[in-house]
Every structure is written in C-alpha cells, then in structure tokens.
C-alpha cells in the first residue's frame, strides 16, 4: 500500500507533499524504513533542483534589472511560494513575462551571455540558463489555434500590465502575477493539459 502511494504521488508530481504529510503520522503508521530512505533521497533531489532554479531566476532577474527590464514569473516557482514548504513544489522550466520587452531581452541574452535563443516556438522563445530551460513569453497562449485564444490573450495582457506583489528571489526582486491573471492563466493551462494529455494532482493543488 505504501509503495502504491509512493509511486502514485511520484507520477502525480506531489511526491514531496506526500512526504510532508507522512511526517504527521505516528511512527507505527509510517512506511518501511527502506521506502522512507528512498523517499527521502528523492525529496532531497527535488529540493536541490529547486535551489538550482532559484539561483538561475535570481541571476536572470539581476541581469534584466541591469538593463531596466522588469521580470514577472509565471507558474512554477511563483506558485511554489504559496505552498507550506516551497521547495517541495517541483518546478520545471522558468516561465517569464517581460512586459512586452521580450525581443530586446532575447538580444541582450544572446549578445552578452552568448546563449542561443530558440525563436521557433508557439508563444515564447526559449534559452538555457545554467542548465535550466527558460520560456520567455511574448504571448500567454497560442493565438493561431483557436479564435477564443485571441480574446483570452487580450485579457491576459490587460491583467499582466498590472503585476501582483514583488518578491525577493535570492535577494533579487521579481514580480508575481496578479490574482486575476494567476487564476485565469492557471485554469487555462490546466484545461490545455487536460485536453491534450491529462491533468495531474499538482495542477489541482496549484
């Protein structure tokens, strides 16, 4: 039974949250020691990846700040800050919004860091920072697939013009989306996952 819980929580992207919940149980109700050790090792791996991403975000935000470009975090890391243990919410790519200054920012990254920027994506460009993929959004959704996306995009950009709170990531200030933008964008993102692949428990928790 515990092995099934472990495997399922891993597939659903909530392995570290399940670990946190397991700590609340009496010793007699916890899984066997061998499984706990395996679990702990993988939670530690999640934490290390989170710290790497945190450093990459801080480096990127500091670089943009030198050029007077504000940066907003979308999904991932920004959402983790709402969790009881932020570093236990796994983050994939770093999704950013630069308030319409994406083309300028990409040229700066390519010129000053020598980092190749992939422009052949649907609604963002991509590049690598310290081994972590960055998605630099010029649109929030792919406007070419559905007419409704174009209407949504106008709404996303309207909300994005007024960012939410500013938080410090390793001492560097970044913006988070407003509550309105977060709610709409996350629901849209989850709907796309549900239609194209599936929707995991991590999306529900977000």
Regions picked out by a protein language model, each given a short descriptive name:
Residues 1-92, 98-206:
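Conserved NTP-donor binding/palm subdomain of two-metal-ion nucleotidyltransferases/polymerases, i.e.
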């Amino acid at each position: 039974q515990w092995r099934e819980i472990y495997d399922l929580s891993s597939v659903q992207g909530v392995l570290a949250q399940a670990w946190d919940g397991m700590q609340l149980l009496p010793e007699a109700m916890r899984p066997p020691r061998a499984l706990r050790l395996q679990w702990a090792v993988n939670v530690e791996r999640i934490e290390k990846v989170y710290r790497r991403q945190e450093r990459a975000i801080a480096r990127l935000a500091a670089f943009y700040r030198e050029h007077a470009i504000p940066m907003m975090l979308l999904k991932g890391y920004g959402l983790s800050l709402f969790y009881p243990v932020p570093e236990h919410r796994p983050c994939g790519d770093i999704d950013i919004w630069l308030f319409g200054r994406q083309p300028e920012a990409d040229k700066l990254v390519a010129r000053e860091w020598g980092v190749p920027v992939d422009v052949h994506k649907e609604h963002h460009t991509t590049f690598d920072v310290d081994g972590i993929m960055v998605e630099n959004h010029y649109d929030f959704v792919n406007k070419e697939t559905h007419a409704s996306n174009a209407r949504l995009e106008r709404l996303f950009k309207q909300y994005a013009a007024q960012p939410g709170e500013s938080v410090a990531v390793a001492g560097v200030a970044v913006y988070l989306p407003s509550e309105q933008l977060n709610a709409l964008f996350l629901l849209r993102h989850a709907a796309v996952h549900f239609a194209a692949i599936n929707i995991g428990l991590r999306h529900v928790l977000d």
